[in-house]
């Protein structure tokens, strides 16, 4: 037998190298084979519920890191809640209708206008389902557990039926109407857009100052005055029908170069500088209210331009007079309604001028800027043309500019229940406080919701028309359509004639002959996803409404958060969520948006292949997701180093509890060694912190707390001296079993705590905890913090001891630098303490030499002031470090004067303590001795 054979060296097959990319797919297969998600749900049957409702990602293309951030975050929450005593089903969803899928078909050579509509819709469906399958596989590879076999898809018949019922309820309450007013129009996709489908990009545009000659000034101004406007959309001048002045502003008539111009008095200096007017003479000042109902002439068409009043006119830029084209601006439209101006919008679906703009027919609207400017110049109405860069709305799908264009559309009126939505916004728990302000302002300021789209792939608007063109939407018709959709899917709308989509025997005064037609437009996809509270939470009996949490990217304040609360308040009077948490965007390591053109994109699959999903998950836990976050392969490499610390700690704990059976070997708390009590109480505090952090969705706090505990409490202190106990002491000694008791509790509960973040690693570790009854760590319960009497005093004492230890370590380091010692085990430490330190050492009642990893620790009877000159002085003690007397023990490596003095020749190389252990545990050595 060798000396090392008398040591309790930790043994484990738990590998130091994780090999996550190779192992994780096997774990995911094991979870699926064991129906782990379902088993956890069964365990929690009858417990309080927690509903995290999944916002549906769009079914198009591989997932990106933003998807990963979102799905991993949700999985962390659901796993935690499930282990914390909640029934927390997680039903993933997909948004499966809309323009991007039509665009993908177009790229593949399938053109909607050249195909049978039903064939085209089937191709859309097949493409969407293929994308769902692909993304589902991607999400599973991240370790996300969910009801993957029963997701919700916005194209499923039962979902479409539920959506129709939401529409029907809103129509029944009078919120749905058809109107013609300016809305965002995308010429590139030939469809209307909602505000949520708009993104802004910087563009270079022309701006012009235009003079409109007066026709009738009501005798209040000279008849030869000209009203000056400024616009950034010259192409809308053909649609001009009026000019707005603010009723409360003063306007000046100025004489310049033989002409008389009207502009806001406060803007005169700025405009004069811009137009290079020299010494403009103010002839007259008049209130804006006096300008109302004056008439000007259109610059190049034979029609009138009405001067009107509007409060929204500002003096931030321009002239204080605003060009009005009711067919191309929302403010223009609403403010001019009281003047009964017609809505002129001479632009077609593709963005080309119609014959309502004579001379411009067939010209693209953007090309109209040049022609209009030329015409104005010829009429001497163009005072200045210049170019500037500004933020302009674009179609978020095609990335092309959009315009405001008045077209017949279906709208959801928000005004009738806007205040109800705002009241609900106030009631919701916004995990990020500014989220409330953001959504509140959006709801407060938004116009009516344009819900119709001129596309094919989507849920049809369940609207019929009578013989006289009157729209027909009744509870009877919408419910009948909902039932048809539930049975056949929405394709039935395109398969059947209108009469075959109506209830049998249906009659309506608008169709005395019983003839009907049907709406051709489909619904905005935001109405699709915005109805998910009904299509999912209300439709599935194991879910409940409202959801406890909606968690999505910060772009969803204008999107899903907004559309969901709008439809839910309209129908139910309440928000569909109790709490909302948003996340920032994922940027590259330099803080730039990820873009294929820059070449800085990181694909989740590349991360999982190189590092493993657990590293990506640990990164998610390590960041503040409330704002934009950065990621790069270098950052992920740093995260993998942190992971290595966690893994090595788990491995050490497994190895050193491998011969520990908690049922037989555990020590009661009261009998634990003082330092072990401290570590158990310290870990109990960690559990308390982590439970609170998980409850608050603060993953970064969970991460930091765990890493801090592993690094500072375990690695730098407890496990640093642990080898002197678990390796050296007798296998079944109280000292060793005391420490193993604490190690086992920490190991077991730390694994449970890690399950939500590192599920693959946690489950791998769990297989080494053979005494735990659950087959999977995920089936265990989350540890709860215990109430331990006297814990505050104990923590206080030990914090003071650790401060004391820092001073000793500083003195040891100084001695090492002075070559007095090599390793700390070569040292004898003598301290000269004040009474406070003496009291502290008495209170902790410990083997201080062992905790400090020195051979001897001596408390001198002398006070601090009597310490030798060579001692390191502190306020409350002096520390003298000397080389320990004696020889090094071949077993524990301590320097001890008893080494070499044992009566038994075979034990002479051991200190007295080790010799006693060997004598007791290995009596054969007394006769046989050790091998060389």
Curated annotation (Swiss-Prot):
Keywords: Aminoacyl-tRNA synthetase, ATP-binding, Cytoplasm, Ligase, Metal-binding, Nucleotide-binding, Protein biosynthesis, Zinc. L-isoleucyl-5'-AMP binds at residue 552. Its cofactor is Zn(2+). CDD domains: Anticodon_Ia_Ile_BEm, IleRS_core. SUPFAM superfamilies: Anticodon-binding domain of a subclass of class I aminoacyl-tRNA synthetases, Nucleotidylyl transferase, ValRS/IleRS/LeuRS editing domain. GO terms for biological process: isoleucyl-tRNA aminoacylation. Pfam families: Anticodon_1, tRNA-synt_1. It is an enzyme of class 6 (ligase). A motif ('HIGH' region) lies at residues 57-67. One of its GO terms (molecular function) is aminoacyl-tRNA deacylase activity. GO terms for cellular component: cytosol. It catalyses: tRNA(Ile) + L-isoleucine + ATP = L-isoleucyl-tRNA(Ile) + AMP + diphosphate. Belongs to the class-I aminoacyl-tRNA synthetase family. IleS type 1 subfamily. IleRS has two distinct active sites: one for aminoacylation and one for editing. The misactivated valine is translocated from the active site to the editing site, which sterically excludes the correctly activated isoleucine. The single editing site contains two valyl binding pockets, one specific for each substrate (Val-AMP or Val-tRNA(Ile)). Catalyzes the attachment of isoleucine to tRNA(Ile). As IleRS can inadvertently accommodate and process structurally similar amino acids such as valine, to avoid such errors it has two additional distinct tRNA(Ile)-dependent editing activities. One activity is designated as 'pretransfer' editing and involves the hydrolysis of activated Val-AMP. The other activity is designated 'posttransfer' editing and involves deacylation of mischarged Val-tRNA(Ile). This is Isoleucine--tRNA ligase. The lineage of its organism: Bacteria, Bacillati, Bacillota, Bacilli, Lactobacillales.
């Amino acid at each position: 037998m060798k000396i090392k054979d008398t040591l309790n060296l930790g043994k484990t097959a738990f590998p130091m190298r994780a090999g996550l990319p190779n192992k994780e797919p096997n774990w995911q297969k094991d979870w699926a084979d064991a129906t782990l998600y379902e088993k956890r749900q069964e365990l929690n049957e009858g417990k309080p519920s927690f509903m995290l409702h999944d916002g549906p990602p769009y079914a198009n293309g591989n997932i990106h890191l933003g998807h990963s951030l979102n799905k991993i975050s949700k999985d962390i929450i659901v796993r935690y809640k499930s282990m914390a005593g909640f029934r927390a089903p997680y039903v993933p969803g997909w948004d499966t209708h809309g323009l991007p899928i039509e665009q993908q078909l177009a790229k593949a050579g399938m053109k909607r206008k050249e195909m049978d509509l039903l064939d085209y819709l089937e191709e859309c469906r097949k493409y969407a389902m293929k994308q769902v399958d692909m993304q589902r596989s991607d999400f599973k590879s991240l370790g996300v557990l969910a009801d993957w076999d029963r997701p919700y898809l916005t194209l499923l018949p039962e979902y479409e039926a539920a959506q129709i019922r939401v529409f029907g309820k809103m129509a029944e309450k009078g919120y749905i109407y058809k109107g013609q007013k300016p809305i965002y129009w995308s010429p590139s996709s030939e469809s209307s857009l909602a505000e949520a489908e708009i993104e802004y990009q910087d563009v270079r545009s022309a701006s012009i100052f235009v003079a409109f000659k007066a026709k009738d000034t009501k005798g209040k101004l000279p008849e030869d005055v000209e009203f000056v406007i400024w616009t950034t959309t010259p192409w809308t001048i053909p649609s001009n029908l009026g000019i707005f002045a603010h009723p409360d502003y003063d306007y000046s008539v100025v004489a310049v170069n033989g002409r008389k111009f009207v502009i806001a008095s406060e803007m005169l200096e700025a405009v004069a500088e811009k137009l290079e007017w020299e010494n403009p003479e103010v002839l007259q000042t008049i209130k804006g209210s006096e300008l109302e109902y004056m008439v000007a002439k259109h610059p190049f068409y034979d029609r009138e331009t009405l001067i009107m009043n509007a409060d929204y006119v500002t003096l931030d830029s321009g002239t204080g007079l605003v060009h009005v084209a009711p067919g191309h601006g929302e403010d223009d439209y609403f403010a001019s309604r009281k003047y009964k101006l017609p809505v002129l919008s001479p632009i077609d679906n593709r963005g080309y001028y119609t014959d309502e703009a004579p001379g411009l027919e067939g010209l693209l609207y953007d090309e109209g800027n040049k022609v209009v400017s030329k015409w104005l110049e010829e009429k001497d109405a163009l005072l200045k043309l210049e170019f500037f860069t500004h933020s302009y709305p674009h179609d978020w799908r095609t990335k092309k500019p959009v315009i405001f264009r008045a077209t017949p559309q279906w709208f959801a009126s928000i005004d009738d229940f806007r205040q109800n939505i705002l009241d609900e916004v106030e009631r919701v728990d916004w995990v990020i406080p500014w989220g409330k302000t953001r959504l509140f302002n959006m709801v407060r300021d938004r116009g009516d919701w344009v819900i119709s789209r001129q596309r094919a792939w989507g849920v049809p608007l369940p609207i019929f028309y009578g013989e006289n063109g009157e729209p027909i939407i009744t509870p009877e018709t919408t419910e009948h359509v909902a039932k048809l959709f539930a049975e056949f899917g929405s394709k039935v709308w395109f398969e059947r004639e209108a009469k075959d989509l109506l209830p049998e025997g249906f009659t309506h005064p608008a169709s005395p002959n019983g003839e009907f037609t049907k709406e051709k437009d489909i619904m905005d996809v935001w109405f699709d996803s915005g109805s998910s509270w009904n299509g999912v939470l209300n439709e599935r009996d194991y879910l409940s409404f409202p959801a406890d949490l909606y968690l999505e990217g910060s772009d969803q304040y204008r999107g899903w958060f907004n559309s969901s609360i709008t439809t839910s308040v309209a129908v139910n009077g309440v928000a569909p969520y109790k709490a909302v948490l948003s996340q920032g965007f994922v940027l590259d390591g330099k803080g730039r948006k990820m873009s294929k053109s820059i070449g800085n994109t990181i694909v989740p699959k590349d991360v999982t292949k190189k590092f493993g999903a657990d590293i990506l998950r640990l990164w998610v836990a390590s960041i503040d997701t409330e704002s934009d976050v950065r990621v790069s392969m270098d950052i992920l490499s740093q995260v993998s180093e942190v992971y290595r610390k966690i893994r090595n700690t788990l491995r050490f704990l497994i190895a050193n509890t491998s011969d520990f059976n908690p049922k037989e070997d555990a020590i009661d708390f009261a009998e634990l060694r003082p330092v072990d009590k401290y570590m158990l109480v310290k870990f109990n505090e960690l559990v308390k912190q982590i439970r609170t952090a998980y409850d608050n969705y603060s993953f970064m706090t969970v991460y930091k707390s765990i890493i801090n505990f592993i690094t500072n409490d375990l690695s730098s202190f407890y496990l640093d001296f642990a080898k002197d106990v678990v390796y050296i002491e007798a296998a079944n000694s109280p000292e060793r079993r005391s420490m193993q008791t604490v190690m086992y509790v920490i190991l077991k509960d730390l694994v449970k705590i890690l399950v939500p973040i590192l599920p693959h690693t946690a489950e791998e570790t769990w297989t080494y905890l053979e005494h735990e009854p659950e087959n999977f760590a995920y089936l265990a319960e989350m540890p709860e913090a215990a109430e331990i009497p006297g814990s505050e005093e104990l923590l206080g004492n030990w914090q003071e001891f650790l401060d004391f230890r820092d001073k000793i370590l500083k003195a040891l380091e100084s001695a090492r630098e002075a070559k007095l010692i090599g390793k700390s085990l070569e040292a004898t430490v003598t301290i000269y303490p004040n009474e406070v330190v003496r009291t502290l050492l008495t209170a902790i009642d410990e083997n201080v030499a062992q905790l400090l990893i020195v051979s001897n620790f001596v408390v001198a009877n002398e006070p601090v002031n009597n310490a030798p000159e060579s001692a390191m002085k502190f306020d409350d003690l002096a520390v003298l470090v000397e080389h320990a007397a004696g020889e090094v023990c071949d077993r524990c490596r301590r320097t001890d004067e008893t080494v070499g003095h044992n009566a038994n020749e075979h034990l002479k190389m051991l200190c007295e303590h080790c010799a006693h252990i060997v004598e007791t545990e290995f009596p054969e050595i007394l006769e046989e001795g050790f091998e060389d």
